[in-house]
């Protein structure tokens, strides 16, 4: 049986601690139970109210709403489908309250990309922080473009997996 050299894991543990600390320092109001008032999320809540009320009354999922555009399917405003196993995986990607969890995922994802490309750990930490703390990320978080933030957060991880599987392609 091989022994784990914990000393070699230390830089990566330090990186994760740095990412968590910076995310929660930036988003410290979430530790007090506060949330960002995101305009798109407020609009979504208004659009989904009829669907949510129907589910509370009947216990069934509604796939149509009359409250938007004289009627439309609820697929874009949060219809839930049986057998959607990816939603469970998706929900486990985020540790703690949002937006801190979005930032942590963004930091870790870009950190892994830089490591996969052969960049040393210290520069990978700096690069991950620069990528995660860019102004655009905060703009889209403020207005409620959460799915766009998740796409930005996960893309470096996808690229790192492509690079690992086929190093000559990236």
Task: Report the location of each language-model feature.
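Start-transfer (signal-anchor) and selected internal transmembrane alpha helices
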Residues: 1-27, 163
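Residue-level signature of transmembrane alpha-helical entry/exit and packing/kink sites
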Residues: 8-16, 103, 124, 148
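Membrane-helix interface segments
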Residues: 119-125
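Catalytic or ion-translocation cores adjacent to nucleophile or general acid/base/metal-coordination motifs
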Residues: 154, 158
């Amino acid at each position: 049986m091989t022994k784990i050299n914990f000393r070699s894991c230390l830089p990566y543990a330090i990186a994760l601690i740095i990412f968590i600390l910076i995310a929660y320092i930036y988003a410290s109001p979430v530790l007090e139970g506060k949330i960002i008032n995101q305009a798109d999320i407020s609009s979504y809540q208004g659009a989904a109210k009829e669907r949510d009320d129907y589910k509370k009354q009947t216990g069934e999922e509604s796939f149509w709403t009359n409250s938007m555009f004289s009627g439309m399917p609820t697929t874009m405003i949060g219809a839930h489908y049986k057998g959607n196993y990816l939603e469970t995986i998706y929900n486990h990607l985020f540790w703690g309250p949002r937006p801190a969890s979005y930032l942590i995922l963004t930091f870790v994802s870009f950190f892994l990309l830089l490591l996969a490309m052969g960049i040393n750990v210290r520069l990978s930490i700096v690069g991950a922080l620069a990528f995660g703390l860019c102004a655009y990320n905060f703009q889209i978080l403020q207005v409620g473009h959460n799915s766009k933030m998740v796409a930005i957060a996960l893309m470096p991880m996808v690229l790192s997996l492509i690079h690992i599987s086929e190093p000559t392609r990236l």
